[in-house]
Amino acid sequence: MKKISTPLTVQMINSLKSGDEILLTGTIYTARDQAHKRLSDAIKKGKKIPVVLRDQIIYYCGPTAAPRGKAIGSCGPTTSSRMDEFTPLLLSKGLRGMIGKGRRSEEVIKAIKKHKAVYFLAYAGCGALISKFIQRVRLIAYKDLGPEAIYRLEVKGLPLIVAIDSRGRSIYN
């Protein structure tokens, strides 16, 4: 398994190939449908957004509350296609990676290639297991969205699979 850390660099991303298994360490951000809509709307209106996207990763996840003594509750991946309408814009603003589950649209694949990004798969159905790789959690924005708010996660050795690499090659083909 390859070990990578955030922030992502173009050189690092270009070294990844569809199907590679990786262990990710560093900072990632959670965001689902409603957070993506708010980010997108703010960008379109020229407003400042609450997170710097450049070279960062968004995990499509809505974590549950943390049990006593844990950093986070269950935090499995959300179906990525739900974010497809917002993804090209976020990639154009410097977002470098996404974590989720399932296929992506052709428009997203083209944007991944254009902006030298990468799409990772998290293991679906393993939300409780994934939580063991998360060391710290901090609310960043949109508290009113509850689990769909944007959280900053500090992860160590999070196992992922490269689903779509920076050349647009997909494990689904």
Summary of predicted features, one role per range:
Residues T30-A31, A35-L158:
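Feature captures the catalytic cores and cofactor-binding loops of soluble hydro-lyases/lyases
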Residues T87, I161-N173:
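Active-site/ligand-binding-proximal alpha/beta "capping" segment
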Residues M1-L8:
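Short, structured beta-strand/loop micro-motifs enriched in basic residues and often containing a Trp
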